[in-house]
Amino acid sequence: MKIVLISGLSGSGKSVALRQMEDLGYFCVDNLPLEMLPSLVSYHIERADETELAVSVDVRSGIDIAQAREQIAYLRGLGHRVEVLFVEAEEAVLVRRFSETRRGHPLSNQDMTLLESLKKEREWLFPLKEIAYCIDTSKMNAQQLRHAVRQWLKVERTGLLVVLESFGFKYGVPNNADFMFDMRSLPNPYYDPELRPYTGMDKPVWDYLDGQPLAQEMVDGIERFVTRWLPRLEDESRSYVTVAIGCTGGQHRSVYIVEKLARRLKGRYELLIRHRQAQNLSGR
């Protein structure tokens, strides 16, 4: 049976993610105490219900991170496919969302300010984030989060999932990256008026960067680094690794390098491609 655990920071969009799972046909349970998870799975199996499970767990249920990891290992040992999704956002964004909704933080009744509650929650959940696929919703609306969840679920995983993500430094760096590479030293197609309207997915930009020795050296170097260290992360039972590749605006160089690297890693690892700034890309 496939089981998806959804966790993350309050105000980051866990409820939206869970509703998306429900719309996709998952049997969803919100705020389930973790000690009840094996019983829920057993009950589901006894009913001969083939519907996949999605369960939201967070600080409201007094989540014990050590227990969470034990439960995940236990269920995987029984042959179940357990995936973990962690939803987060930047602190300033969360503060704004709480202010707009006028809702209190789940930990705010413990004599803590909102900022203190957010910091405590982030520290508390960090060990769970380490084994999860992370979605940062800081610059997302509900529809974009739903799309990100659907894209993640499309990838069939049997081993380590490598997320290759392009981004623009001027919009901020992704906080869920395991490895980050800076492409701003490469020749920039943006300064060519004929190339500016395109992205790193388009043939004119590919032709331009294919002809730049520095760009090819960069791809070679990242490929060597990634293929050197990914096996070590696999040995540590990591399920997801995010490789973030940035340029100034996240439209040309970083997109090109991600796509180029994906072609080289295809067949060796399960890949998920994300372009944070280049939302509407045409194919090469």
Swiss-Prot record:
<feature type="binding site">
    <location>
        <begin position="8"/>
        <end position="15"/>
    </location>
    <ligand>
        <name>ATP</name>
    </ligand>
</feature>
<dbReference type="Pfam" id="PF22740">
    <property type="entry name" value="PapZ_C"/>
</dbReference>
<keyword id="KW-0342">GTP-binding</keyword>
<dbReference type="InterPro" id="IPR053931">
    <property type="entry name" value="RapZ_C"/>
</dbReference>
<dbReference type="GO" id="GO:0005524">
    <property type="term" value="F:ATP binding"/>
</dbReference>
<dbReference type="InterPro" id="IPR005337">
    <property type="entry name" value="RapZ-like"/>
</dbReference>
<protein>
    <recommendedName>
        <fullName>Nucleotide-binding protein NGO_0315</fullName>
    </recommendedName>
</protein>
<dbReference type="InterPro" id="IPR027417">
    <property type="entry name" value="P-loop_NTPase"/>
</dbReference>
<keyword id="KW-0547">Nucleotide-binding</keyword>
<feature type="binding site">
    <location>
        <begin position="58"/>
        <end position="61"/>
    </location>
    <ligand>
        <name>GTP</name>
    </ligand>
</feature>
<dbReference type="Pfam" id="PF03668">
    <property type="entry name" value="RapZ-like_N"/>
</dbReference>
<comment type="similarity">
    <text>Belongs to the RapZ-like family.</text>
</comment>
<dbReference type="InterPro" id="IPR053930">
    <property type="entry name" value="RapZ-like_N"/>
</dbReference>
<comment type="function">
    <text>Displays ATPase and GTPase activities.</text>
</comment>
<keyword id="KW-0067">ATP-binding</keyword>
<dbReference type="GO" id="GO:0005525">
    <property type="term" value="F:GTP binding"/>
</dbReference>
